[in-house]
Amino acid sequence: ADPANYTGIQRSAAYYDPIGWKRAVREVTVAFEPDMANAGLPMSGAALSTLGVTNRLWPGGPLPADYEYQVDEIEFLHEDEYDLFLTDPTDFVIRYYWPRMFTSLAPLAKLPPLGGMFQGFEGLTAMLSTPEFAQAARAIEKAGKETREFRKNIGDSYAELAELGFP
């Protein structure tokens, strides 16, 4: 059962009220006694907003508080980029995928190919010290703090459900 339908909590609680969401999940689990319990996949809406997530829409963020979570099908791997991806997937993810998926990471698209940079990091320092990279670093730091706080508040929901007898 959907905690929002059963308990009346807004779906946005999964992103902005981790304690309330955890209580609602526990209430549904105890009421329905499933063979296996799912604590859901709540995440910090504040962190998602800070990062500028482009491929997901969540209640209380880009969507009204009572809407369902949605995926926005954006083309992250363009037809002419398969060779880049297959040659060096890590480079592709950092320089192409992340900047498309997170607006805050757009500056990463300006990085040179990373595959041959075994000892060349010092050459990147001028680029990495620009205001746009500093802004990206601040967004990462803020999102990290939001995520840590969210996780602290939600705790280990799976372990708590297991203690109630729901693996």
Protein language model regions, located:
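Catalytic cores of TIM-barrel enzymes
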Residues: 1-167
